[in-house]
Amino acid sequence: MTTEPGLTLYADAFWISPYVFTCFVALREKGLPFAIEEVALQDGAQHKTEFRERSITGRVPALRHGDFWLAESTAIVEYLEEAFPRSPRVLPTDVKARARARQMLSWIRSDLGALRDERSTTTMFYDRSVRPLTHAGEAAAEKLARVVKTLLPEHGGPLFGAWSIADSDLAFMLHRLILNEYELDPKVRAWADSQWWRPSVQEFVTRSRPTYSAY
């Protein structure tokens, strides 16, 4: 009888990476047991030979499954879906809904750069931002809110029929604004808040974090 090799998630030591968030929530929602290893990015631990060579890109999050290593959050989510098909899904089952969810996961990683810069995740878990959004930041905030509102069903529930990791990722992005007192459309705000209180999300959000050191 063989034993399934264990999973280990490699996370940043401050737990502020939105991409670590994605993987952490996905693992919790799939009900998969996993160990956690923190990588001290502020000390350059990601550049150490062992981690860099095994993860290939030297980035967090990274996932180890037995002797297999993988980095990049969307790749990790896809791997978990395929490697553990009997566990609860974190992407929609319908092919078109799944494609749309993947579109959103890709979009928030490749667009909205001004918002990510001006409302970094440090402002969610450490000191809030005191600077108003620039024109570019405001445009990105408005675009994010518009996209979510376009996707929202009338009842305000999950975006693609049943909850998916795209719901949590979009809500996390919206909370860069919410936690810094940005006024959103009430429907969008209510939806983001409902997603924020999901137990797997709250487990990440309420983790104890060390004093922040910039890197």
Which residues does each predicted region cover?
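GST-like fold's C-terminal all-alpha helical module
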Residues: 4, 108-199
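GST-like domain detector, emphasizing the conserved glutathione-binding G-site
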Residues: 1-135
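Terminal-tail/helix-coil boundary detector
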Residues: 204-215
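Conserved beta-strand edge residues that scaffold enzyme active sites
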Residues: 41-42, 191, 209
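Phosphate-coordinating loops and pocket residues in cytosolic domains that bind phosphorylated ligands
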Residues: 53, 197, 206
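A generic structural-conservation signal
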Residues: 36, 60, 186, 204-205
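Active-site-flanking alpha-helical
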Residues: 81, 173-174, 205
